[in-house]
């Protein structure tokens, strides 16, 4: 069993919901990102999504877009992100999932890209702009390497499409809670409970809910609705960006612990 699936299997046996925080690599700097990964692992993260800064992030809201812009302005590239993973992954228990748009994969070539991220210690991959219809090559190549490609289900997806995505997704299924981009919201999308119930009819794979979860109370609600994982991005990135890097890391640790407590 590969790392992401194994993590969920262990959590299910204990009756626990996974916490998956997201960070943008290189914001505010690479050293702080490395330390943030260690802190999140220590503070209760079960898996960690690490975003590769990209100049045209279609799925990202203003907080993560701004973080990506800051990282790009400092010259952060894929190889820098992988250097962080290589440095940190053996020190932490949480598997690292790389979040990247498809263009860097296309530019390097699927096999070269996957070989590089596997060698660095990445365990999973999320590609938000990869259509289901074009996912087979990447799914086959990740499976060959013991990596897991996590596919996204949109709230607007038909039941037939939800079924098709869930069948192909590796590790877990990423359920997008709202239409639109990522970002901090005051309440979780009202359709999430029904979406989760619908997904449960078509798959027994773990389901993670993301986009818009920003408060412990929201995380607790999503768990109560039956999610196997809560994914928190913009609210994490926002806290890390506030104040000095030291202050940001302290805020990140506190927030991560609060979220983990809420879903435990």
Swiss-Prot record:
One of its GO terms (molecular function) is tryptophan synthase activity. Its EC number is 4.2.1.20. PANTHER family: TRYPTOPHAN SYNTHASE ALPHA CHAIN, CHLOROPLASTIC, TRYPTOPHAN SYNTHASE, ALPHA CHAIN. One of its GO terms (biological process) is L-tryptophan biosynthetic process. Transmembrane segments: none annotated. Keywords: Amino-acid biosynthesis, Aromatic amino acid biosynthesis, Lyase, Tryptophan biosynthesis. Pfam families: Trp_syntA (PF00290). Pathway: Amino-acid biosynthesis; L-tryptophan biosynthesis; L-tryptophan from chorismate: step 5/5. The active site is at residues 49, 60. NCBIfam families: trpA. It comes from the Bacteria. Tetramer of two alpha and two beta chains. It catalyses: (1S,2R)-1-C-(indol-3-yl)glycerol 3-phosphate + L-serine = D-glyceraldehyde 3-phosphate + L-tryptophan + H2O. The alpha subunit is responsible for the aldol cleavage of indoleglycerol phosphate to indole and glyceraldehyde 3-phosphate. This is Tryptophan synthase alpha chain. Belongs to the TrpA family. It comes from Synechocystis sp. (strain ATCC 27184 / PCC 6803 / Kazusa). The keyword Lyase applies. Gene3D superfamilies: Aldolase class I. SUPFAM superfamilies: Ribulose-phoshate binding barrel. InterPro entries: Aldolase_TIM, RibuloseP-bd_barrel, Trp_synthase_alpha_AS, Trp_synthase_suA. GO terms for cellular component: cytosol.
């Amino acid at each position: 069993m590969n790392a992401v699936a194994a993590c969920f299997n262990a959590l299910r046996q204990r009756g626990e919901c996974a916490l998956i925080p997201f960070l943008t690599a290189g914001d505010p700097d690479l050293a702080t990102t490395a330390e943030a990964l260690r802190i999140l692992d220590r503070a209760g993260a079960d898996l960690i999504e690490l975003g590769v800064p990209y100049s045209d992030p279609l799925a990202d809201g203003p907080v993560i877009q701004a973080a990506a812009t800051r990282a790009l302005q400092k010259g952060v590239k894929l190889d820098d992100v992988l250097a962080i993973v290589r440095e940190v992954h053996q020190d932490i228990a949480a598997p690292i999932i790389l979040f990247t748009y498809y263009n860097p994969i296309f530019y390097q070539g699927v096999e070269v890209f996957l070989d590089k991220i596997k060698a660095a210690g990445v365990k999973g991959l999320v590609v938000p702009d990869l259509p289901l219809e074009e996912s087979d090559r990447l799914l086959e190549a990740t499976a060959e390497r013991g990596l897991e490609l996590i596919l996204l289900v949109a709230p607007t997806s038909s039941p037939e499409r939800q079924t098709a995505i869930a069948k192909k997704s590796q590790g877990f299924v990423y359920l997008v809670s709202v239409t639109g981009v990522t970002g901090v919201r005051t309440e979780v999308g009202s359709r999430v409970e029904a979406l989760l119930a619908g997904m449960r009819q078509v798959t027994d794979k773990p389901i993670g809910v993301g986009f818009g979860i920003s408060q412990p109370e929201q995380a607790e609600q999503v768990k109560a609705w039956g999610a196997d994982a809560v994914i928190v991005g913009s609210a994490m990135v926002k806290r890390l960006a506030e104040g000095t890097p030291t202050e940001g890391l302290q805020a990140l640790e506190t927030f991560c612990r609060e979220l983990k407590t809420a879903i435990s």
